[in-house]
Amino acid sequence: MTSSVVSIAIKQLNKDKKISGVGFNTSMTPASNIKILTVLGSLTSGDTIPSIKYKISNDTLRISSTGYPFIAHPKYDDEDLETFIKSFNHIVYHKPNIDLTKYGPAWAWDDFKYYFQAERSEMPIYGNVIQIVREFNDSIKVTPDIFQVVNNLKQKEKVYRDHQENNFFINPSLIKAGDTIYYPFVTSRKITMNLLESFFETSISYDEDELNNYKIWNSKV
């Protein structure tokens, strides 16, 4: 940090009086300072996080979301949770008490095509992105495979998607062997249900009622 220019201002919530800080009288362009708090929180949050709410009724597993982002995630799998859910033949997904907009405050709508702006959803799955891999035998593998993907050798982008539709177009000639591309898909409850069924390889029922008297499954991080 000795070669960096840093400015930090610390003050009480709802009060404009600064308590302390470093270089806070220097004019600077604000950056993503919340990342500092994110790192601090992750270092002090322990070794598990709540991943799903669940309730077992006879041979049926009832689940609801906590917002956990790593179900079927392309980079960070959760084998213990996935094995637990797959051990049931009957699964019911309960509507979670989560109210989200697809984009956060100040998110740019035209960044919808970038992996770092995957849509927010009540139950993220696959990281809310598709993974496109050009394998060394020149075949193209798309995960998950429930969306329509069309080759278009005329387009200038490697991957293109209509803004509000899950119609994907790829130009294989621009994708090198071994390349991996992550591209956000449009989320919805129907898409979530379809992806859950595809990943867990079983039919999943939907229940509008919130899940009550549930337990919490904690996943290791």
What residue spans do the PLM features occupy?
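A common structural microfeature
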Residues: 5-7, 33, 60
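Glycine-/proline-rich flexible loop or hinge segments
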Residues: 18-27, 61-63, 180
